[in-house]
Regions:
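Accessory alpha/beta interaction modules
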Residues: 1-158, 169-171, 294
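Short, charged alpha-helical interaction segments and adjacent helix-coil junctions
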Residues: 2-17, 21, 25, 44, ...
Length: 294
């Protein structure tokens, strides 16, 4: 058992070292550090003096009866502007409308009842993809709302920035995206971000923290599954409900890990289970709609 635990721990450490910043799981852990997040946003905004007040990662917005949203990185600066960083590795349909839904969800959560619409904060969405979303050979697509005839700008305070990791225009943003792809812990070119990555990948404290983050992730999935199973147990019998809850917790955990861009090998190493994980993983991958919660 002792040898198995050591081997499992080494496998997890190896998986952590293989992660890069195009994994929203790893990006969330890296950028919950305020200095690292500030470094990234200063480059994305071309604003070297930008000051971040607070950062929240995996920020959940839930509304009864509607599609829930989990935001990868949500930050606020000293002038109360809001920034959201989203990572997408799957080249599937609906990205632009997904951004539309994200912005509306953020607006709903930040505008209190009775407040005027002018109190909506300035919002910048950075939608980072591992493919060129417009196939126009640009690193960045900055979107503005304009009148079709005279190109008059209608600024509603929402700024959409579509950025990809594949087109290298030799700009500072492209250099940052190259680092996102490679995320070599020996690359020191990106200051506090490089330091954060090295800490998480190489130090004992960093890898322990990553393991804690993974365990927290598993617990959230377990709690969600048990909650649903126990609710069903009200009508189907408590024992059966708890059994269903345990099964749902595993499904929920695997699904959350898949959404966070973890592959089968990474998930099975963390859960220490190949056979059942493989069955559930294949069902999730081939499901027609995998985005019940973002």
């Amino acid at each position: 058992m002792y040898d198995t635990n050591i081997q499992n721990n080494e496998r997890i450490k190896k998986e952590i070292r293989s992660l890069n910043l195009t994994s929203d799981f790893f990006l969330s852990v890296a950028l919950e550090d305020k200095a690292a997040c500030e470094y990234v946003l200063r480059i994305l905004m071309n604003s070297p003096d930008l000051k971040i007040k607070q950062v929240k990662t995996q920020y959940s917005i839930r509304q009864i009866g509607t599609h829930s949203v989990v935001l990868d990185i949500l930050a606020e600066d000293s002038s109360h502007k809001i920034y959201e960083i989203e990572i997408q590795t799957g080249d599937k349909k609906g990205h632009i409308r997904r951004v539309r839904y994200i912005t509306s969800s953020i607006d709903t959560s930040f505008l209190n009842k009775g407040n005027d619409y002018t109190q909506l904060p300035e919002l910048h969405i950075f939608y980072i993809t591992t493919f060129d979303i417009a196939n126009a050979n640009q690193t960045v697509y900055d979107i503005i709302r304009t009148d079709k005839i005279k190109s008059i700008e209608f600024d509603n305070g929402v700024h959409e920035h579509y950025i990809n990791t594949v087109v290298d225009d030799e700009s500072p943003i492209a250099a940052l995206m190259n680092y996102f792809k490679n995320t070599d812990s020996n690359d020191t070119a990106h200051g506090v971000l490089s330091e954060r990555v090295k800490y998480l990948k190489e130090s004992e404290g960093g890898t322990s923290y990553m393991c804690e983050f993974i365990e927290k992730f598993r617990e959230e999935g377990r709690s969600e599954g048990l909650r649903e199973g126990l609710t069903r147990g009200m009508t189907q019998g408590i024992t059966q409900g708890i059994t269903q809850g345990r099964q749902l917790s595993k499904i929920s955990t695997i699904r959350k890990m898949y959404i966070k861009n973890m592959n089968f090998n990474q998930i099975s190493d963390v859960l220490d289970d190949d056979n059942e994980v493989k069955i559930i993983y294949d069902i999730i991958v081939n499901a027609p709609d995998k985005d019940d919660e973002w």
